[in-house]
Swiss-Prot record:
Has the structural arrangement of an alpha-helix connected to antiparallel beta-sheets by disulfide bonds (CS-alpha/beta). GO terms for cellular component: extracellular region. Blocks potassium channels. The keyword Cytoplasm does not apply. It holds the Pfam family Toxin_6. Belongs to the short scorpion toxin superfamily. Potassium channel inhibitor family. Alpha-KTx 09 subfamily. This is Peptide 2. Expressed by the venom gland. Disulfide bonds: none annotated. Keywords: Ion channel impairing toxin, Neurotoxin, Potassium channel impairing toxin, Secreted, Toxin. GO terms for molecular function: ion channel inhibitor activity; potassium channel regulator activity; toxin activity. Transmembrane segments: none annotated.
Amino acid sequence: VGCEEDPMHCKGKQAKPTCCNGVCNCNV
């Protein structure tokens, strides 16, 4: 599928959540 940024994953944080195959990681 690949990876894409999901800005709605982390609220109230200046982060770029990267979602890969349903797994999201918040990069603060």
